[in-house]
Amino acid sequence: MKEIIIEPHIGIGQLKLGMTSDELENALLQMKKQWSNSSDEAMQMECCAETDDPNLITGRYMDNDSFFLVQYRNGKAAEIGIQRDLSKVASIKLFGMDMFNTAAECIIDSLMKKDNVICNEKDLQLGTEYFFSEIGVRLWRERAFHPKLLKDPVYMEEMQAVLEDEYQYQYFQMVTVMG
């Protein structure tokens, strides 16, 4: 399995902080050859302004195997993010840890030995965003889960409502007539 190394303050694999969008796109296409069985498949690339700051541009790069999110400041990559999908075909490592196949709690504990963390929740086990400023790494997950939640009656009541909602997917949601 291909290995992609995350280097704090440097980059992810061949994608380096400080690259222009053209340089980064070329490096990404080179990296893609290493993980993709269909390297001829087009990679979708788009850059757009998402804030009022004219110096900040967001780049999105995706194909069937991967999704990268890049923030450009003044034309240079200031942040490079890699999404979990690529972990199906490559091992993505930071400080030797497989970042998408290691429990979040273990990763957070390990990184806290190197740096202080800023978390969006008081309970670190239930946060969704973690920022380690000294090592220059941000971690994100859509929702948090920890086994201790299964002991919380309020959580279990909410989850029961979610499960009941899921039952609707036993039935079709659309029927189409074609001529």
Residue spans of the language-model regions?
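Hydrophobic/aromatic-rich structural module bridging two neighboring secondary-structure elements via a short loop
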Residues: 50-73
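Non-cytosolic coordination micro-motifs
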Residues: 1-52, 79-179
